[in-house]
A protein has these predicted regions:
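Amphipathic alpha-helical segments in well-structured domains
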Residues: 80, 84, 137-140, 208, ...
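Alpha-helical structural signal in soluble globular domains
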Residues: 86, 90, 94, 142, ...
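Charged docking surfaces used in two-component/phosphorelay signaling
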Residues: 102-109, 227-232
């Protein structure tokens, strides 16, 4: 019953609730004080921890590792305990606070449950969402839709967030990403490029003007790009053009049928990106 309540509250949380809850902390504290890092224990999964360490060292954050197995016997196995020991040793070596819990159950459900008491979910992107109907069964999609926390995906090695590309379409979801972008620009000195593709030409100007005014309010200088192409360019291509090492965007928008037929920008980005993608719900 408790699990069902957590899942329900998380899935029905309003867009903007995460940002509103952290507006004060944004000016007085760090934005990411507790970070959830699910780990399979496989070699590539450790990239997520290394990215978490980059963030923790800048944010003075606590890292909460999570290794999920199917049975109690697996949880008590040497393999699971080795994952825990390695996680905590890497954190100690980096002078970062970090502990790992071994849990039993469904991976997606456990991640959503644990995310409630953290500020960010950081995951290694091994199997990005596919296309067509298969996209609806993607664990990443489920986490994005049902968790009230933003999700940072790591497809390859960790990056320092030196240059960020913000995909901004004026939606409430994109405003969440704008909030994080402004924070990184102010506190991390991240260089920012704002890219807008959706809408007619007049709307694009209005949309970018909103982002410009918001960033200028926070004394953030940025590059502003408006797409002149009829067909939207993949965000990873634009990120590469401007040498960005981070993409920020809102989560899925529009109806699911449209996303299946045409494809969601989030899913398309996750399939082709080689740099971390910060997705705001």
């Amino acid at each position: 019953a408790v699990t069902d309540l957590i899942m329900k509250r998380s899935a029905t949380s309003e867009t903007g609730s995460w940002r509103k809850a952290r507006t004060i902390a944004r000016y007085t504290e760090h934005l990411f004080e507790d970070i959830l890092i699910p780990l399979s224990g496989q070699s590539e999964s450790w990239d997520a921890l290394h990215q978490g360490i980059v963030i923790a060292q800048r944010e003075n954050a606590r890292l909460h590792g999570l290794h999920i197995v199917k049975t109690k016997e697996e949880a008590e196995s040497n393999e699971a305990q080795e994952v825990k020991a390695r996680f905590e040793q890497i954190c100690r070596d980096a002078n970062v606070q970090g502990t790992l819990a071994v849990d039993v159950g469904d991976i997606t459900t456990r991640i959503i449950e644990r995310a409630i008491v953290t500020d960010l979910i950081l995951v290694k992107l091994v199997n990005p969402p596919g296309s067509g109907l298969s996209v609806l069964n993607s664990p990443f999609r489920t986490i994005i839709e049902r968790s009230s926390r933003p999700l940072l995906t790591v497809p390859a090695e960790a990056t320092p967030f030196t240059r960020a590309l913000l995909a901004f379409d004026g939606s409430e979801l994109a405003k969440e990403a704008l909030f994080v972008t402004a924070y990184l620009a102010e506190m991390w000195k991240t260089e920012v490029t704002v890219f807008t593709a959706r809408g007619d030409e007049s709307r694009k100007e209005d949309i970018q003007d909103y982002a410009r005014r918001y960033l200028e309010l926070h004394e953030v200088e940025a590059r502003y790009i408006i797409s002149q192409q009829k067909e939207p360019r993949p965000l990873p291509d634009i990120a590469a053009e401007y040498n960005a090492d981070l993409i920020l965007m809102g989560s899925h928008s529009g109806n699911k049928i449209q996303q299946v037929l045409v494809g969601s920008m989030v899913d398309i980005t996750l399939r082709s990106s080689t740099i971390p993608t910060f997705i705001c719900r």
